[in-house]
């Protein structure tokens, strides 16, 4: 059954436009409290990224939860994976994240974690949606929930991240630049890498509520590229606003994407006999990743785009490693969800074990040229079902003669159609992508 409010990654939209409004968040808090409350009280953790609207929505959610009889513990600005970890280790009934991830400050959203620090099951989301359509009530005065703050949350998470590498590990002699996207990782990420011995230069770590993801972070990586070269650093690490995505930059300023990072981690695990099963990618994963893993006899399967689908496929197969080329990387040997800091640490450990630079480590993956064009979606027409779009896709696929792929899909978080073309020659791939994007745009006009 189609969900009314929840998308592929929770509830997300423009601040001030339904459902990203204070009154809806009040009702959402109440509905969540009612859904998680079993017999008597329940306890819910709330964390957020650094966007200014987070304070407003935190208060609204807190009030709604209290009205349902739920106690609330506030974490303040924290990476999304930290909230998953703390929900589990504090044995809370659920965790709530206030974030729109890599989106600009005027967007925001809500996502939930179960008591195990995993994505919320579909049946629980369905229960919350059902409650949202019912009248809001308030428990008896004596049963109203209480709110408190957890003051040592950052320190707990920093130690957890450091614990994902072997005891005694030192990155002394490694010079890195970290781009925190003016987001949730601005305090914890520099501390993790510094405490492990690395020389750290930090950029985009002065959040003001409005500058999150603004020309920085994993979606705007040019500033990090320039800083790595200027500082003559060994590599750069870029997080997004809620630190569940990571990309890297090598010493020459070249971007190392999620496919390449996934390959480096997978090869390291296999060489140490620690890789359980294979690797899960997505429909957007580069064909080069699939071929490179095949050379290592590592199984590879593709899930739908979205970390929730990668995670679902990993769980179904009892595998432990998966991710997206956008930088969502899931290392189940350490975490219950995608964690950018921990994924970056696994890459650094792989480099350390092999005695390689990032340039050397990525060289065994030969990526096929891939072009992605985003087309703004407007109107009621579904371009993916339009005859002219289908005919164009078939025509391009035929012209590529089995030497490439065409994929059109709607974004799960933004009003966009993503047009992806992959093949063995960049100029033709670009031409095909532009051709398809033009047709999609005409249909959407």
Curated annotation (Swiss-Prot):
CDD domains: GlmM
Alphabetical list of Pfam families matching this protein: PGM_PMM_I (PF02878), PGM_PMM_II (PF02879), PGM_PMM_III (PF02880), PGM_PMM_IV (PF00408)
Gene Ontology molecular function: any one: phosphoglucosamine mutase activity
SUPFAM superfamilies: Phosphoglucomutase, C-terminal domain (SSF55957), Phosphoglucomutase, first 3 domains (SSF53738)
Post-translational modification: Activated by phosphorylation.
PROSITE patterns referenced in this protein's UniProt entry, alphabetically: PGM_PMM
Keyword Phosphoprotein: yes
EC numbers on record: 5.4.2.10
Family: Belongs to the phosphohexose mutase family.
The protein's name: Phosphoglucosamine mutase
Lineage, uppermost ranks: Bacteria, Pseudomonadati, Pseudomonadota, Gammaproteobacteria, Pseudomonadales
Gene: glmM
